[in-house]
Amino acid sequence: MKHTTKMLEDDPYLDSYLDAPWAKAPKAYQNIVHEDENVIVFKDGFPVTEGHLLFVPKKRQRRLDITICFEYAWEWGVKGIMNYKWEAFNIGINNGVAAGQSVMWPHVHMIPRRKGDVEDPKRVKGGVRHVIPFKGYY
């Protein structure tokens, strides 16, 4: 079965990354940690841990833009483990309003994890499965 991305007439996505709230907030540009022809990387304005970064593609090319962002996020996460003594990291995306997406331009979160950043790590076994409350346990 071939996977396709259906485009809706009432597509909620922005036309350009420059239309997103982070592009209009001067503070966001003060927090840029990397920029090249493909991606802007900056510190999240509402970080859940120290080092929480957003990877924002400059072009909207469906799967390609997100693939590039995941690759960058993975590389930065590995560097964080090696250089900043992070224990681990989560990489994630909220795709669509029902998934919690609030900025309607594709972007990837990379969240560093450290010992003690959650009360009982064994209780949250399953990681991202817990985005649906009480359904992540197995």
Where are the predicted features?
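HIT superfamily nucleotide-processing domains
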Residues: M1-Y138
